[in-house]
């Protein structure tokens, strides 16, 4: 059985598309199909698709109504057991990434790895290490990187495709429905899967995302649960503030002790001064 469908969507990002295609083609693991959905790009994307056409299982270049419409097109074409969405400009961490992952013999509904987020090139960015356990509170605060998340294709038939009325948060909504509400089996794999391009995450997009998430939460959960999530968020921020204050005060006390006379101050006295704040 075909294990994986890699779905790439693209719009006027020819250079990023080329990088993504090369990354997919270089994979030493080969039990996958590669689907590219292009939104009728006007740059060099079509030339790149034609150049690599013999290494792409299916591609199309036509108008769509947005990101999630394009992703849903890819899902409906897909034949693999799992779907992975690798946007144009994103690329695998190494040529043996998929081999490492599928040699684990995974069978969970959703499994997800880690990622490296970059803004300009892969040398400038940071790793995102995902949690082993996914909770409602985790999704309330953030999400998981969809470029490093493998989803059983049958889940889209069970719980519906991505909500095309949303601009940014439809994958987040799907994760909550599948993982939190319907308790799908998940597994975190300690493998870096992708470098992903975050240059499209503008402040405007963040505002839209927050608004959409608020609407989704109000539709899916009663107010009393949301109230508890907000309380947890406020408590966590308060604890973080307390910890920062403690560290700052400890630093100032230690600096003062050292400035006075380090050689004459026993270590136990130093520690007593630091922790008696």
Where are the model-predicted features located?
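Conserved donor NDP-sugar-binding/catalytic core segment of glycosyltransferases
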Residues: 91, 95-125
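Acidic helix N-cap motif at the loop->helix transition within catalytic regions
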Residues: 15-18, 43-51
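Glycine-rich, basic loop-to-helix element that forms the pyrophosphate-binding segment
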Residues: 20, 45, 61-78, 96
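A conserved acidic beta->alpha catalytic loop
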Residues: 30, 38-47, 87, 91
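Short aromatic/hydrophobic "clamp" motif used to bind/position activated sugar donors
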Residues: 83
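Conserved nucleotide-sugar donor-binding catalytic segment
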Residues: 113, 127-216, 220
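N-proximal low-complexity "stem/linker" segments adjacent to membrane-targeting elements
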Residues: 1-26
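Cell-envelope/extracellular polymer assembly enzymes that use nucleotide-activated donors
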Residues: 2-5, 33, 173
């Amino acid at each position: 059985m075909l294990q994986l469908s890699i779905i790439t969507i693209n719009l006027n990002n020819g250079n990023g598309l080329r990088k993504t295609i090369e990354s997919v083609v270089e994979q030493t693991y080969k039990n996958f199909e590669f689907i590219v959905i292009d939104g009728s790009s006007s740059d060099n994307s079509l030339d790149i698709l034609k150049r690599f056409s013999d290494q792409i299982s299916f591609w199309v270049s036509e108008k769509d109504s947005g990101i999630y419409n394009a992703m849903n097109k890819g899902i409906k074409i897909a034949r693999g057991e799992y779907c992975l969405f690798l946007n144009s400009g994103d690329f695998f961490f190494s040529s043996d990434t998929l081999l490492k992952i599928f040699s684990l013999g995974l069978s969970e509904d959703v499994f997800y790895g880690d990622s490296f987020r970059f803004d300009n090139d892969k040398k400038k960015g940071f790793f995102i290490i995902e949690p082993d356990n996914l909770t409602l509170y985790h999704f309330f605060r953030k999400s998981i990187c969809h470029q490093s998340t493998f989803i059983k294709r049958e889940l889209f038939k069970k719980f519906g495709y991505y909500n095309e009325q949303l601009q940014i948060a439809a994958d987040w909504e799907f994760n909550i429905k599948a993982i939190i509400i319907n308790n799908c089996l998940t597994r975190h794999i300690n493998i870096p899967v992708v470098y992903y391009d975050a240059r499209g995450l503008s402040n405007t997009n963040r505002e839209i995302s927050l608004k959409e998430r608020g609407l989704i939460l109000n539709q899916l959960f009663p107010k009393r649960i949301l109230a508890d999530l907000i309380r947890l968020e406020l408590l966590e921020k308060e604890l973080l503030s307390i910890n920062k204050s403690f560290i700052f005060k400890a630093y100032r006390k230690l600096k003062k002790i050292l400035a006075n006379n380090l050689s004459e101050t026993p270590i136990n006295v130093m520690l007593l001064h630091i922790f008696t704040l």
